[in-house]
Amino acid sequence: MKFLDFFRMGLVNLSRRKARTILTALSMAIGVMCIVVLISVGLGYEAAYRENIEAMGSLTKIDVTPPSDSTGGRTALLNDKAVDAFKSLNGVEAVTPVVQATAWLQSGSYIGSAKLYGIDLSTAESFLIYPVEGEMPGAGTHLRPEIMFTDDMAASFADPDKDWEFALNADGTPKVDLLHSTIKLTFDYANLSGEYQEGADGRAVSAGNMYRLKISGLCSAQNYTYATSGFLDKTRLEEWISANSAFIPQRSLEDTGGQKTYDLVWVKAAEGDDVQAIAKVIRDAGFQTYSLNDMFESVK
């Protein structure tokens, strides 16, 4: 038999079993379409999940914290030596120690509170901390330091004389203009409430220091990751903490051999693919790590 005969025989057989042939072809088509749809849904879910995570911050940022306990031998210290070691790791773009404190702010009769982050400002843009209005802060002076607040800070001020009613206009805009108002900062609420203590000469003096701020700009709160926060030079915030030790909890040096250590260090990976490898090296050195990249990797 020739090829044409085989072809003709196939057509005859197909014509005798039209229903079965159509159903088979239709089933295969539906199966292929289902596979394509499932793959598309999976890719779409991954993309949507990634967008949601990225809205909370950078997928290439790693938070490094001290070991949870000191049992089982020598404890890794999160100090300047460790910071330098992190900087030398392959794939690392930027590293900064993070000093943290909480302070009270005053603008006229309005009061607010802010979480302060003292960082190496030269690394700020690597961690997506940059001004959306104004400019990056410098070191400023001891009595009038420069600071950059998040763009939700103004709306958080409230009036203590009106049962802490938020300082907002009728249209919902903040009454406090951070970039053009006089803003003062203190770590002692008594400074704001008018309470005083007796000085050495018997006169009434405020218990804590009051600083007049120079606000250089406003940055994004990154989907509430840094809600009502301020960023300033790390050294300047360390000076404040030292000068206001009565109102800010101090880290004990007994367990660190007298060395200055940090509660938090930020590490920025140059590429997303490097995050897990860098985090593993840091964990192997005895530290704890956390990254939004961990959440993303968990659904892959």
Model feature map: region roles:
Residues 1-35:
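N-terminal Sec/SRP start-transfer signal
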Residues 2-6, 74, 78, 291-298:
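Juxtamembrane loop-helix boundary motifs flanking transmembrane segments in multi-pass membrane proteins
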Residues 14, 53, 85-87, 282:
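Hydrophobic C-terminal alpha-helix "anchor/cap" residues
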Residues 33-61:
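Alpha-helical transmembrane segments
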Residues 49-52, 258-300:
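Peri-transmembrane interface segments
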Residues 63-260, 264, 273-277, 284:
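Short acidic/glycine-enriched loop/turn elements at secondary-structure junctions
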